[in-house]
């Protein structure tokens, strides 16, 4: 059970050459992991808010320096010292810190990158691949049904004779 030592955010570029957020989480046991927040080509009205700087002089307004500052200051300070294995607590702390319905204050790009980097750190700390680490969290319900019945309820009688 390693605790979060620090979190570092930075601006990187996605596959389309647009700025996006990368977060790196460092644990007290010297394990670290990074995650990059993806950004879609189109956004819907009810999606979480992707925080962009809107400064037309920097990458046509698409830079994410404010979201990176949120990671390096607000988010890092809030999550430092928390157990990285408690993903639910980490995510709740991120939601509480943001305080908005659609992550307008910190930016969904910042919170997602931090959350994913933390889960990758926890998986590494537990010496498991991420899919196995997360796979232990969820399980599918096992359907219970009766496919083959016994014959105890069937009454077998003599066949009836045809009427003459």
Where are the language model's segments positioned?
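Short acidic-glycine loop/turn motifs at beta-strand connectors
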Residues: 26-31
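Glycine/threonine-rich beta-strand-loop-alpha-helix active-site module
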Residues: 123, 127-144
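Metal- or metallocofactor-binding catalytic centers and their adjacent structured scaffolds
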Residues: 38-128
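Glycine/serine-rich anion-binding loops at beta->alpha junctions
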Residues: 13-15, 19, 99-118, 143-153
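Short beta-strand scaffold segments in enzyme catalytic cores
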Residues: 21-25
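Single conserved hydrophobic/aromatic residue that forms the stacking wall/gate
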Residues: 154-164
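Short, Gly/Pro- and small/polar-rich lid/capping loops
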Residues: 1-19
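Well-ordered beta-strand positions in beta-sheet-rich domains
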Residues: 32-36
């Amino acid at each position: 059970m390693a605790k979060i030592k620090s979190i570092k955010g930075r601006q990187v570029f996605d596959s389309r050459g647009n700025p996006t957020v990368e977060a790196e989480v460092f644990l007290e046991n010297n394990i670290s992991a990074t995650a990059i927040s993806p950004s879609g080509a189109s956004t819907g009205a009810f999606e979480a808010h992707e925080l962009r700087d809107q400064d037309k002089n920097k990458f046509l307004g698409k830079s994410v320096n404010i979201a990176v500052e949120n990671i390096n200051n607000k988010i890092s300070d809030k999550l430092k010292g928390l157990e990285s294995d408690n993903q639910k607590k980490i995510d709740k702390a991120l939601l509480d810190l943001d305080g908005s319905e659609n992550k307008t204050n910190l930016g969904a790009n910042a919170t997602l990158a931090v959350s994913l980097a933390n889960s990758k750190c926890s998986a590494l700390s537990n010496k498991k691949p991420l899919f196995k680490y997360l796979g232990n969290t969820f399980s599918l319900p096992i359907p219970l049904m009766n496919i083959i019945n016994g014959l105890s309820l069937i009454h077998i009688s003599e066949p009836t004779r045809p009427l003459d």
